[in-house]
Amino acid sequence: MVTRLADIFKRLRLGRDYEDIIDTVPIDDGLQANIRNIEEKSKELNKSLYGKQQAYAEPFLEVMDTNPEFRTKRSYMKNSDNLHDVLKQFGNNPILNAIILTRSNQVAMYCQPSRYNERGLGFEVRMRDLDAEPGKKEKEEIKRIENFILNTGRDKDIDRDSFQSFCRKIVRDTYTYDQVNFEKVFNKKNATTMDKFIAVDPSTIFYATDKNGKIIKGGKRFVQVINKKVVASFTSREMAMGIRNPRTELSSSGYGLSEVEIAMKQFIAYNNTETFNDRFFSHGGTTRGILQIKSEQQQSQRALENFKREWKSSFSGINGSWQVPVVMADDIKFVNMTPTANDMQFEKWLTYLINIISALYGIDPAEIGFPNRGGATGGKGGNTLNEADPGKKQQQSQNKGLQPLLRFIEDLINTHIISEYSDKYVFQFVGGDTKSELDKIKILQEEVKTYKTVNEARKEKGLKPIEGGDVLLDGSFIQSMSLNTQKEQYEDTKQKERFDMIQQFLNSPDDEEPQQESTEDKVDGRESNDPTKIDSPVGTDGQLKDQDNVKSQEGSNKGQGTKGKGNEKPSDFKNN
């Protein structure tokens, strides 16, 4: 190879023809080998990804963040780096607060153990397996867990939040930020024992990132940021993170989608409408009109100045509403300044905004004091089927909004608190609206009439079976069963009668001590005095009882034909 290259350089130096040199340049086998090696490594890399996540959960090009230690919650709004700051600005909206306070009060009804309530309303810790029966040890541990949740800690501390206060806080947090955070504090001596849990401001908790800007999957995954500085870091076990509306969007960085963010336009429109309507009163624009009196040109300017002073002094503010200013002029003319209905349709517009916001939170506007009379704007059209029954509307509203909220809180407690004790227990809210319970009873009544027996229904409720409970409580079914029972009883009676007759027939008179019968009865075949004998028309001699005894007559004739033989007479024989 070296000799070949030296020959080529020599020919080039001497100026010889070099066209044949191009054809004789050897192929670099090493380059092709490197290409093949890269291809093989690429295939091996793809094979190594099998069994691991291949889809991207974060942007391929890492987000350029001014804070490299954590990932902020970004907003679709312009000039906003942290969505938490934007959402916090709308936290004082009256419609949002009406929804939050309503749901908080409803959740607070469940924030005590159900065993403390006569109606069984509250929360309970039970066995995860419904078929498992808790023993004495399990029952004691269940009560201990319930008391821990009720006091938000192992001991009762008046300076610490109760479970009701804790739930009120996280309801506001999840409805504002769609993020709930609470810290779990463990015992200093025993790191496996949790002492208490405390709600934390979610606007200060962020996902931590490594030096490459990627979200940390393990270890100190969460950080608390105050004034754009990291002040504390937590593991997934130490800091609970609850997202009610998760999403797969890469730019979301694992954060949820708040209803406030979705309805941002509606909240801004509501604030603008209230501000516009408020300024209509506060800036003196409430006069109904002007009484204009025409005057000479020299007096017009002076009258205008007087009018301005009078307007500012007498007609500004709420006390100047609906007053009529008067100016000097030659002619009198009234200028109407009262806005028409088309210019101030605030009611329908505000009703529309309230309905949109309420729909996002799954709550009926009537629950927050804005009854909807049909349609998106509260008009007469579009009445719902359940409008005549406010109770049904309220129950449906709670099923859409309250029940999912309770399930969300249940999942938080089970994931981050109950799991610290044992996986065989589960936390849940029980009880509810009385009307709903009555509806369940009505459903159960219909079930036991169609396909479920009484004992099956009692078993589902944890009750013992009762005698005669393996039936359906349906009139037609019970009547049919009664007819079948009567038929079976009739058949049994007939069968018994037949059996008695056969038994009576099979009872032979030889089974008892025979009674003395006269010879005449035996001969004539007359009925015996023995009550055990069957009354038969045939006598013992084989002849009918109602006919003359032939053998008796033959014996009588023979006796008459043998005179002198014996001392007995036929009459004596007969009398015997």
Curated annotation (Swiss-Prot):
UniProt xrefs under Pfam families: Phage_portal
Main location: virion
A single MF term (Gene Ontology): DNA binding
InterPro entries to which the protein is assigned, alphabetical: Phage/GTA_portal
GO biological process: symbiont genome ejection through host cell envelope, contractile tail mechanism
Subunit structure: Homododecamer.
Annotated GO CC locations: viral capsid
Domain of life: Viruses
Basic and acidic residues composition bias: residue spans: 519-533, 565-576
Classification of source organism: Viruses, Duplodnaviria, Heunggongvirae, Uroviricota, Caudoviricetes
Record's subcellular location: Virion
Protein name: Probable portal protein
Family label: Belongs to the phage portal family.
Region: Disordered, residue numbers: 374-399, 506-576
Keywords assigned: Capsid protein, DNA-binding, Viral capsid assembly, Viral contractile tail ejection system, Viral genome ejection through host cell envelope, Viral genome packaging, Viral penetration into host cytoplasm, Viral release from host cell, Virion, Virus entry into host cell
Function, as annotated: Forms the portal vertex of the capsid. This portal plays critical roles in head assembly, genome packaging, neck/tail attachment, and genome ejection. The portal protein multimerizes as a single ring-shaped homododecamer arranged around a central channel. Binds to the terminase subunits to form the packaging machine.
Organism: Staphylococcus phage Twort (strain DSM 17442 / HER 48)
